[in-house]
Curated annotation (Swiss-Prot):
The name this protein goes by in its record: Large ribosomal subunit protein bL21
Recorded name of the encoding gene: rplU
InterPro entries named in the record: bL21-like, bL21-like_sf, Ribosomal_bL21, Ribosomal_bL21_CS
Family classification: Belongs to the bacterial ribosomal protein bL21 family.
Keyword rRNA-binding: yes
Function of the molecule: This protein binds to 23S rRNA in the presence of protein L20.
GO terms under biological process: translation
Gene Ontology terms, MF aspect: rRNA binding; structural constituent of ribosome
UniProtKB keywords: Ribonucleoprotein, Ribosomal protein, RNA-binding, rRNA-binding
Subunit structure as annotated in this protein's UniProt entry: Part of the 50S ribosomal subunit. Contacts protein L20.
GO cellular component, one term: ribosome
Keyword NADP belongs to the record: no
Source taxon at top rank: Bacteria
Amino acid sequence: MYAIVEIAGKQFKVTKDLYIYTPKMDQEAGSSVSFDKILLLQNDQDIQVGDPTVAGAKIEGKVIEHVKGDKIIVFKRKRRKGYKTKQGHRQGYTKVLIQNILR
């Protein structure tokens, strides 16, 4: 059984007991979280496609930890002018364990 779920504008294919990295959420580590924007739900041979979401479907998960992604360097330079700037950025992510997919 798997589902396609939309979390913070991004789509994830999830199954039970799967760890996913979502954009940073406000919940504390250890708290439970549920998602109700299920776009597609597959159970054995039955596939339900939402219009736009599957009614009554819900995914339960648990927030494991908050982490940062790899550092991205933004470097700007203008030739012959002596202008250069260097800026770094690390995006925040939340690690979520998918515990259950409910219809």
